[in-house]
Amino acid sequence: MGPGFQDAYHAFHTAQDERQLFRQIASVVRQLGFDYCCYGIRVPLPVSKPAVAIFDTYPAGWMEHYQASGFLEIDPTVRTGASSSDLIIWPVSIRDEAARLWSDARDFGLNIGVARSSWTAHGAFGLLTLARRADPLTAAELEQLSATTNWLANLAHALMSPFLMPKLVPESSAALTAREREVLCWTGEGKTAYEIGQILRISERTVNFHVNNVLLKLAATNKVQAVVKAIAIGLI
């Protein structure tokens, strides 16, 4: 019988930083009967190459090989998790586009695994993976994992995000005023400063004042980038 939500909840809240929290997550994963675990988070910025942070207890050398081989770009669990929050089960067959990934993983002792994704309001995508060397998954275990990994992945992501988002996306901590959000929203609709002033019944100069404040808060070089950043991290 694995750990319950309340036990994990209280244990996780004792963590002072992301590394302590991950150790607590790994402990719960071991209690669930898995040798290894991995938590990864991908944030929406920079748009051209979203920042990623990964924590794992995998066998030595696997993550270095994984990253050097570019497996992140073709990993089916990442692709599936990005569009579905269902339990992801590692394939028994390795005859797919990621055949080398699965083959190499097995060479490192990563034979059996499941994964579960979750999201936060700031657009951060999290993926929790549980893996082990042997013992195929049974129908009863999968039924249990379907429920357990749901709360575990969401709890882990919800508590990891406050530690990691300010480091990976400093803009996520920006506090925009109601007026700044209004100005940004209308800017996103393609309105000029003059038109926004007419809509909000404020001067064009005041509109530009709010725009400049937003640019500073979001570390943006222009209005377009400010709108993109604000939408990506859920500020508007």
Swiss-Prot record:
An example GO biological process term is: regulation of DNA-templated transcription
Keyword annotations from UniProtKB, A to Z: Activator, Autoinducer synthesis, DNA-binding, Quorum sensing, Transcription, Transcription regulation
InterPro entries xrefs: Sig_transdc_resp-reg_C-effctor (IPR016032), TF_LuxR_autoind-bd_dom (IPR005143), TF_LuxR_autoind-bd_dom_sf (IPR036693), Tscrpt_reg_LuxR_C (IPR000792), WH-like_DNA-bd_sf (IPR036388)
Query: Mind listing where the DNA-binding region sits, in residue ranges?
Result: 193-212
Q: List GO molecular-function terms, semicolon-separated.
A: DNA binding
UniProt KW Plastid keyword: no
Give the domain of life.
Bacteria
A Pfam family of the record is GerE
Which intervals hold domain HTH luxR-type? 169-234
Q: Does the keyword DNA-binding apply?
A: yes
What SUPFAM superfamilies would the database entry show? C-terminal effector domain of the bipartite response regulators (SSF46894), Pheromone-binding domain of LuxR-like quorum-sensing transcription factors (SSF75516)
Give the similarity note. Answer: Belongs to the autoinducer-regulated transcriptional regulatory protein family.
Q: What is this protein called?
A: Transcriptional activator protein SolR
Q: Organism, per UniProt?
A: Ralstonia nicotianae (strain ATCC BAA-1114 / GMI1000)
- Organism classification: Bacteria, Pseudomonadati, Pseudomonadota, Betaproteobacteria, Burkholderiales
